[in-house]
A protein has these predicted regions:
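A short, solvent-exposed loop/turn motif at the edges and junctions
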Residues: 175-184
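Glycine-centered loop-to-beta-strand initiation motif
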Residues: 155-163, 169, 173
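Short, acidic Ser/Thr/Gly-rich low-complexity loop/linker segments typical of extracellular
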Residues: 144-158
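C-terminal motif of bacterial Sec signal peptides marking the signal peptidase cleavage site
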Residues: 7-10
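N-terminal export leaders
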Residues: 1-2
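Mid-length scaffold segments of soluble, non-membrane domains
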Residues: 99-148
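N-terminal low-complexity, Pro/Thr-rich disordered segments
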Residues: 13-54
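Extracellular beta-sheet/turn segments enriched in Thr/Pro/Gly and aliphatic residues
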Residues: 96-98, 104-111, 190-203
Length: 203
């Protein structure tokens, strides 16, 4: 096939128990004020303001960080997407857990030759092979076959594209690039479900 991989780098936040702020069981729509275990007692706004994220809600923060060019990605900020929370920490010891309400965020990096293991997506460190490539994406309910998403997505400079999917479901997702395709099962039903998909090898 004609695809040429641009680069491949690992994801430092690839395990279900990866280091980062402790998940907060409260998802009432407000950010946690103060640090979680191990962090300094900094208010919510301090971390966000320090990284140019003040005034954004959780969804906007995720989409903003996902879309940054590689040069723009902060080296001193970790942002881990969990099924119900965005866990953030920085080099100053500030930690923050923001609730993700409504739809489930899944970030996907199709690949041809090389990939890396990942489970919970790291918005600032995860990199996939195919950057800024158009991908035909189809997501259907695994039980009924109902198509819930179909269209063209473009991978960001980090090689990933993100989808907001209905929470609580089981789906089949197909990705196609230049005639090469892959189909896999995905789930948005539990707190253990992956938010990072790096196993779709296009053939």
């Amino acid at each position: 096939m004609a695809l040429a991989p641009l680069f491949l780098a690992g994801c430092r936040n690839d395990e279900p128990d990866a280091a980062g702020p402790t998940p907060d069981s409260s998802t009432d729509g407000t950010a946690t004020d103060g640090a979680t275990s191990g962090g300094s007692q900094a208010g919510t706004g301090d971390l966000l303001a320090a990284h140019g994220l003040e005034g954004m809600d959780t969804r906007e923060i995720i989409e903003h960080l996902e879309a940054l060019t590689l040069d723009e990605r902060p080296q001193d900020l970790m942002a881990s997407v969990r099924p119900s929370q965005l866990l953030m920490s920085d080099a100053e010891g500030r930690e923050l857990a923001l609730p993700i309400e409504g739809d489930f965020y899944l970030s996907t990096a199709p690949f041809v030759e090389g990939t890396h293991e990942c489970w919970f997506h790291s918005l600032t460190t995860c990199r996939g092979e195919l950057a800024e490539v158009e991908v035909e994406v189809r997501v259907a309910d695994a039980s009924t076959g109902e198509v819930i998403h179909e269209g063209t997505e473009r991978t960001h400079p980090n090689g990933f594209f993100g989808l907001w999917l209905p929470r609580g479901g089981s789906y089949e997702m197909t990705c196609t690039v230049d005639g090469a395709t892959y189909t896999t099962a995905i789930s948005t039903a539990t707190e253990d479900d992956a938010t990072c998909l790096t196993t779709m090898q296009l053939t």
